[in-house]
Structure formats: C-alpha cells, structure tokens
Amino acid sequence: MLIKQFSRRSKNMKVQILLAFAALFVLAVGSYASESKKLDLRDALFSAMFSADYQLNPQERGCRYFLGECKKTSECCEHLACHDKHKWCAWDWTIGK
C-alpha cells in the first residue's frame, strides 16, 4: 500500500514539473517574440532617421547636412566628412573657419 501511494505521488509530481516547464517555455517564447518586435521597430526608426535626406535635394542646398546620405566627403557641408562605414555625413572634428 505504501508503494502505491509513493507511485501515485511520483506521477503527480512529474506532471506538475512538466507543467511548470511548459509554462516557462511559453513565457520564454512570448518574451522573445516581444523583444524581436521591439528590435525590428528600433531598426526601422533608426533607418528612417538617418535616411531622412528627402527634405531637400543636395542640388538645392549645395551640400549635405549632418547625417545626410553621402558617397564621398565632397558631398558633405563644411566641417563634415562622409563616414566610410555608414555612408552619412559626420563631424570631421574641425572647428572654426
């Protein structure tokens, strides 16, 4: 009789542990999906901010302003240089005339 009670408790405990792991798995998947959506939104916002060169054509203003898209430094305004990796105009660390 003692063995039957132990066996029944053991099965009950196994089911509880299995349910706990299943619940943790569901929470982990939900958290990962939520974080993935946040990262996608953040990437979209950054790309929209840094490609906001649509406001004026470079022909109208003569040069590209800070964080404007560029291919070479000569396209950027004074005190700005075309960043090699990101291809936008960044400050070239010079001050004055």
Curated annotation (Swiss-Prot):
Residues 34-61 form a propeptide. Ion channel inhibitor. Keywords: Disulfide bond, Ion channel impairing toxin, Knottin, Secreted, Signal, Toxin. GO terms for molecular function: ion channel inhibitor activity; toxin activity. It comes from Cyriopagopus hainanus (Chinese bird spider). It comes from the Eukaryota. InterPro entries: Huwentoxin-1 (IPR011696), Huwentoxin_CS1 (IPR013140). GO terms for cellular component: extracellular region. Disulfide bonds join C63-C77, C70-C82, C76-C89. Expressed by the venom gland. The keyword ATP-binding does not apply. Residues 1-33 form the signal peptide. The keyword Signal applies. Coiled coil: none annotated. The presence of a 'disulfide through disulfide knot' structurally defines this protein as a knottin. It is found in: Secreted. This is U6-theraphotoxin-Hhn1a 1. Belongs to the neurotoxin 10 (Hwtx-1) family. 12 (Hntx-12) subfamily. Pfam families: Toxin_12 (PF07740).
